[in-house]
């Protein structure tokens, strides 16, 4: 089982790397977001957020997605649109890690860190430092 998990994580990280580069997001930041959101499991769903990057269908539609919600369980599709949203948050935050994850988690127009955002930022920084 461990071998499969490592293989799945490796192929997911290849997808993350490709889309992070295409969207101008540092790989370590993109990888940390996926790890926090789904632990690399493309089948995760929580509160209407789906897949690897836990993106809601309405949010995905806002960055060009036109498929059915279930299509967001596909790793490639999910990361395509999740990374577009993350890249916008990254640009709006001037590349600041905490600002990026705050906007990714709470919406692009969030401008005050809440406790959940602070915890997310701490996790992201720890993951980025260990990668």
Which ranges hold each PLM region?
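Non-catalytic cell-wall polysaccharide-engagement segments
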Residues: 1-15, 21, 62, 66-73, ...
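Extracytoplasmic
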Residues: 11, 25-30, 47-50
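Short, functionally critical alpha-helical segments immediately adjacent to catalytic or ligand/cofactor-binding
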Residues: 25-41, 79-83, 100-106
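Glycine-rich phosphate-binding loop at the start of an alpha helix
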Residues: 27, 49, 54, 69, ...
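Generic alpha-helical secondary structure signal
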Residues: 28, 54-58, 95, 99
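Short, small-residue-rich loop/turn micro-motifs
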Residues: 34, 56-59, 128
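Short glycine-biased active-site loop of nucleotidyltransferases that positions the nucleotide triphosphate
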Residues: 43-45, 113
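Substrate-binding/active-site groove segments that recognize
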Residues: 48-66, 82
């Amino acid at each position: 089982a461990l071998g499969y998990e490592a293989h799945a994580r490796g192929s997911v990280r290849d997808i993350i790397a490709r889309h992070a580069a295409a969207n101008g997001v540092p790989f370590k930041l993109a990888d940390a977001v996926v790890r926090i959101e789904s632990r690399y499991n493309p089948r995760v769903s929580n509160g209407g957020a789906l897949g690897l990057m836990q993106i809601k269908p309405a949010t995905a539609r806002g960055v060009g997605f036109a498929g059915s919600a279930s299509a967001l369980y596909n790793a490639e599709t999910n990361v395509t649109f999740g990374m577009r949203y993350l890249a916008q948050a990254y640009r709006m935050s001037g590349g600041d890690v905490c600002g990026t994850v705050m906007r990714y988690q709470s919406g692009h127009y969030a401008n005050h860190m809440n406790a959940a955002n602070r915890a997310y930022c701490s996790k992201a920084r720890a993951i980025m430092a260990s990668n």
